[in-house]
Amino acid sequence: MATTKLASGNLRQIAGELPRCRSVLAVCAHPDDESFGLGAVLARFEDLGSSVSVICLTHGEASTLGESAESDLAALRQAELADAAKALSLHTVRLLGYPDGTLGAEPQDRLTADVTQMAGETGADLLLVFDEGGITGHPDHMAATAAGLLAASRLGTPVLAWTLEQRVADAINSAFASTAFKGRVTGDLDVRVEVDRQRQMRAIACHKSQSFDNPVLRRRLAEQGTIEVLRWLLRR
């Protein structure tokens, strides 16, 4: 376990492994978030013996893929999510029908109730979410995280957030003018774990509509290497 000194002078312990859990529920906004973002972490939880499930709040129909009809893209991304779930060996996946792109405008009580229900059904003793800044600043990501936090606070369940090291975010933002990745300095991190990305890469390949030409994703994974970092948003 590594130790880092905070600005306050206190020492912060950075764990070198994920917490041991019976059941992990990942709360995502879009199909592909579970793979592009959380895939390696979910695979590591499974290696440690956790049952891993995902609740995805939208079908991702607002993507810029350019399908002829919005419903076609929604159906395609649903199928891609199902394939990715198999690649990641997920226990349960629930795909809801909230509108993509405006998740933050949905009644928060409804989102929270859906997450709470699935957390109860799966017996989740940990919720996994994107960091509060949504990683890319995407409002849907932030809304999904907020729903997960509210559900967890009602259930008394801890919440662990996937995030990026600040150097990774800075490198991507320097390389691509259109990006606004949010990173965290070392003093904000609680877990730094080495991962095997093989299952994640297989899951990413299932999302062909989103990964066919995605240089930003490739650059992020290259910058991360075999390391994932996380932080606690809510502890038991």
Regions found by a protein language model. Give the residues of each.
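Metal-dependent de-N-acetylase/amidase catalytic core
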Residues: A2-L25, A105-R236
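Active-site rim/loop-helix segments in enzyme catalytic domains that contact anionic ligands
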Residues: M1-G123, L150-R154
